[in-house]
Amino acid sequence: MSSYDALASSYDGLMADGSYRKRADWLERLFRKSRIPVHSVLDLACGTGTIACLLAQRGYEVIATDGSEEMLTQAVGKAAALYGRPPLFLHQAMPRLRLIEPVDTVVSTLDSLNYLTRESDIRETFRRVYRWLKPGGQFIFDVNSPYKLERMDGQMYMDETEDSFCVWRTFFSHRTQVCTYQVDLFRLNGEGTWDRDFEEHRERAWSEAQLRQFLAEAGFQTVTVTGDLTMKSPRADEDRWIFRAEKGE
C-alpha cells in the first residue's frame, strides 16, 4: 500500500491544525520576492489539495501533482466546490515530474520532500523542477529538520476525529537518517464497528548542506534558508526549514 492510501479520506480531519491559510499567506509573501511576476504555480506533492485550492482561489493558475491517487481523489472533490478556475491535478511522483509548459513558481509544503529517501530521487526531482521553471522563477519548499526527526525516535502520537482514530509510532535510524512512521488508522463504519488500516511512512533527514548541494547541481543559483514562517535564519532547534531557490534568467 502506498503512503497515504488509507489515510487519504481522513487526512484533512486529522491534520486540521495544518495552518494552511497562514502558509498560503506566507507563500504569497515569498512570491513577491520573485524576479518575474507570479501567475502560474505548481504545487508539487499537493496531498489533498488544500494549498493548491487556496492559491487558485487567490487567482493563480495552479497545477498540482501527487503520487497518491487516493489523495488526489480528495483534492478533486475539494476543488469542485471552488468558485472560478480550479487547479489542474496530475497523478505524478515527484521524480517523474513532467508538465506541458514551464511555470513561474514551484511550491512544496509540509515536508513532502522528506519522503524522498534516496539521493537519486531527490536529485532527479530538483533537476525536473529546474527544467519546468521559467527563467527567473523560484522553487519554495519546506522540510522537517534533522533535529525534529531525530527527536521523534521512540515517540507515539494520537489524532482523532468523530469517526476516526489514528496512532503514529515513530522510529529514527541514525545509520540511514530515516524516520519511520508506523500508522494504525481506525475508522467507524456504517455498522457501528471499527475498521483498521495500517500504513508505514518514511522521511529522510536531509542536512542543509546536502540540500544546497543538490539544488546547485540542478542549476539553481541563489538559495536562501529560513526558519518556519519567518525571514530569520533557522535556529539550532528549528523543526522546519523553508528553502527558496531561484533559477537564473
Give the residues covered by each predicted segment.
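Conserved S-adenosyl-L-methionine
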Residues: A45
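SAM-dependent methyltransferase
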Residues: I140-Q213
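Conserved class I S-adenosyl-L-methionine
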Residues: M1-H39
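C-terminal lobe and adjacent flexible extensions of AdoMet/dcAdoMet transferase-like proteins
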Residues: R202-E249
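A short glycine-rich, Lys/Arg-flanked "PGG" loop and its adjoining helix->strand segment in the class I
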Residues: R123-P135
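A short acidic, Gly/Pro-enriched loop at the edge of an enzyme's catalytic core
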Residues: R98-T105
